[in-house]
Curated annotation (Swiss-Prot):
Keywords: Actin-binding, Cytoplasm, Cytoskeleton. It is found in: Cytoplasm, Cytoskeleton. GO terms for biological process: pointed-end actin filament capping. Pfam families: Tropomodulin. The gene is Tmod4. Residues 40-64, 326-345 are annotated as: Disordered. Transmembrane segments: none annotated. One of its GO terms (cellular component) is striated muscle thin filament. Binds to the N-terminus of tropomyosin and to actin. The lineage of its organism: Eukaryota, Metazoa, Chordata, Craniata, Vertebrata. It comes from Mus musculus (Mouse). This is Tropomodulin-4. It comes from the Eukaryota. Belongs to the tropomodulin family. Coiled coil: none annotated.
Amino acid sequence: MSSYQKELEKYRDIDEDEILRTLSPEELEQLDCELQEMDPENMLLPAGLRQRDQTKKSPTGPLDRDALLQYLEQQALEVKERDDLVPYTGEKKGKPFIQPKREIPAQEQITLEPELEEALSHATDAEMCDIAAILGMYTLMSNKQYYDAICSGEICNTEGISSVVQPDKYKPVPDEPPNPTNIEEMLKRVRSNDKELEEVNLNNIQDIPIPVLSDLCEAMKTNTYVRSFSLVATKSGDPIANAVADMLRENRSLQSLNIESNFISSTGLMAVLKAVRENATLTELRVDNQRQWPGDAVEMEMATVLEQCPSIVRFGYHFTQQGPRARAAHAMTRNNELRRQQKKR
């Protein structure tokens, strides 16, 4: 056994816990600082983590900030500036840049006929503006002045080219009047199968109760005279869509159905599309602009319905996928061609 190993043997039976219990708090803190794993070569670590904490030392004296600043300022003034390697002599080298003078092109003297000279000399600013527009000098005026002079047979720019352009005064367009349809009376006429009632238009009536719309769809099942049924912007949801689907399975006289701009989800649209397959009289279907996008599965179902239902010749929906859009366009072209051939017979 070597001497080094013999030296280590006497430390094997030492009780480390007993030694730690006899250390003071200051000694324990110093021991903890010594045992910290530091990596001074790791440049990715901050400086405080690459070395031991050295800021807990007691101050060597009082700190006087003003005296320290005064000392630093005095030291900076007393330090002699370093001399230049090559002294500056003030000599200017090279030639200064002088902007070359540009020659102003001489304007060509244009001689006009005496009649034109006299007419132009006595023309007003408004007439000069119209003449410039006729000659195509649109860079001298605004677009409004140019098109007013070209399109109007009279002098429109009465103040000349440099005048302030006034905007056109458009006539106010009033809002469309509300839908005057009486829902209760409409429901009675549908239930009584009125011969004169061929269109049910409830567009933009947003306070219709759901039970009333459900009763209207229920009455449409046995109606044989209504050709168009429109529920645009009525805040209809999936319950109304299911009622419309049940109506389509039994009604055999309806030709146009419009349920655009509502709150129908993909489930409600899928129910309507499945019911359209069982209806052979419907020629127009519009389901666009719902509150949420129906999804790829619904768009594929729309294309399949159009392919399987040759009676539909008008379909209102903006496809977002190329595949269903191409299939639907091909199906609509085929359906319209079949309708045209039937009319020729």
